[in-house]
Amino acid sequence: MNLWLLVCLVASLMGAWSTVHTQGVSEDCCLAYHHRARPRLLMRAQGYQRQEVSGSCNLPAVIFFFPKNKMLCVNPRVNWLPNVFKFLDNRNNTHSKQHLGSRRNLQDSHLGGQRSNTGMSRLAHSKSKSSRSTRSNKKKTSFLNMANPGP
């Protein structure tokens, strides 16, 4: 009888473990809006993504991505939000049109708009700046491609 009880206990713990383990894989989504967001702040974002209601995300939102993996959730019904979308789309399209088909558009966006017009290679340009260390070398580029993925 004790063996049967032990088997039932182990089986129930294994079932509970898989449930607890899969909860950690849930979606990253906005659960509340940031009500103090203003257009000037949002125009400094690296990109944005629209969040639709699905799964555990029960709130429609727009997620703005900033340096150092910071995010800000905004209500999509705010009346000035289309102006911010237009500004970010124009800024990101300008970078991608200048370096179409190359990986330099991600690197150049971290230079703060400084570009080499002399035709120097990226390596030569970085060697000329190696005497000073900038924070832009440490930024992550994972969110730069996320500008306007939605309709």
From Swiss-Prot:
Top-level taxon: Eukaryota
Family annotation (Gene3D superfamilies): 2.40.50.40
Disulfide bonds: 29-57, 30-73
InterPro entries reported in the protein's UniProt record: Chemokine_b/g/d, Chemokine_CC_CS, Chemokine_IL8-like_dom, Interleukin_8-like_sf
PROSITE patterns linked: SMALL_CYTOKINES_CC (PS00472)
Keywords: Chemotaxis, Cytokine, Disulfide bond, Inflammatory response, Secreted, Signal
Gene Ontology CC: one annotated term: extracellular space
Keyword Protein biosynthesis: no
Pfam families to which the protein is assigned, alphabetical: IL8 (PF00048)
First-listed, main subcellular location of the protein, grouped into a coarse class: secreted
GO molecular function, one term: chemokine receptor binding
Protein name in UniProt: C-C motif chemokine 25
Organism whose genome encodes this protein: Canis lupus familiaris (Dog)
Phylogenetic placement of the source organism: Eukaryota, Metazoa, Chordata, Craniata, Vertebrata
Gene: CCL25
